[in-house]
Amino acid sequence: MEEYILEIFNSKEELCAKYKIDNIKILKLDDEGAKTRLALIKTKNSNLKFIFMYYDMELKPQLINFFKRNFIILGIQSKIIRINLENNVIDTLVDFSIIPFFEFLENDSYLIAIFEMGISVISKDGELKWKLELPEILIDWEIVDENIKLSYFDGKIGIHSLQIGELLS
């Protein structure tokens, strides 16, 4: 499988000028208007694959390549999106509505998506294992063995099992 990369643009005009294209199909994750940006997914050889319009929360989207599978995972806005590269089917695995996506973490078994007040765990097969909306804003997180340690704005710390999401302490 080819490696896919993510490129961000401030406007449709900027994207069209760089890639010299006139008519593009944009998948809208948010209404045009407010503070939107474009996220372009392409191969390393510059073959354009997908273009998403999203509300810019000042947090950069993140793309994960699953080289042994035929899909990629995109963390963008408040969503985790799985894109099947064989048939171009786009599935929303997680949508926390207004809770912004921060970043992905990985271990040998799972892909962990960290949100401002949420967490989701995805298997290496691209299936959602579990998701959890959290009671407080996260300020720090780390994988510890097969668990995830979450530190909250109010000073509390929680440790969850990555396998089932259960709060261990």
Regions of interest found by a model, annotated:
Residues 2-30, 51-69, 95-109, 134-147:
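Repeated scaffold domains used in trafficking and secretory/extracellular systems
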Residues 5, 140-169:
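Acidic, small-residue rich beta-repeat scaffolds with periodic aromatic anchors
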Residues 34, 68, 76-78, 86, ...:
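Short loop/turn segments that connect beta-strands within the blades of beta-propeller domains
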Residues 40-57, 89-100, 127-134, 168-169:
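Aromatic (tryptophan-biased) beta-strands that constitute blades/sheets of beta-rich domains
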Residues 44-90:
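A glycine-rich, hydrophobic loop/mini-helix early in the fold
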Residues 81, 120-121, 158:
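WD40 beta-propeller blade core
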Residues 85-88, 123-127, 162-164:
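Short loop/turn segments that connect beta-strands within beta-propeller blades
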Residues 114-137:
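Acidic, glycine-rich flexible loop segments
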